[in-house]
Amino acid sequence: MRAAALALLFPLMAHAIDVQGHRGARGLLPENTLPAFARALELGVTTLELDTGVTRDRVVVVHHDRRLNPDTARGPDGRWIDAPGPAIHSLSFEELQRYDVGRLRPGSAYAKRFPHQQPLDGVRIPALKDLFSLAEKDKAIRFNIETKISPEAPHETLPPG
């Protein structure tokens, strides 16, 4: 009897579980990138979790930190950037697109944490609108969006409002 009741309830419980793709599928592909979000959708997540910043020219972009991360970003010359990386709000969207965020710096704590992440050279930080375009095929997908605008770090973000 108990097993039968659980069998009847399981389909209802499955719809109640929110499976989030944290920064896309960052254990598999470069975090907060369109390929990572596409993989998360392929895997059947119900919510895409992401972080946003705003560039100098007011483009909302998908990126976890208020600054480019030296463990995930390489400059136009292909070299890893130095810490601290430039603040997202100090760059135009065009300038931001010069940075490659498709792999983890070898030997970094990030690389050790995600040893199975597949590198993808040439991957850029996406605009939020591009993520919405990617996800629009799945009408049931939800978003968990954290903004990286902070009154506690006015030198690193645009002002709230």
Region locations from a protein language model:
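Sec-dependent N-terminal signal peptides
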Residues: A3-M13
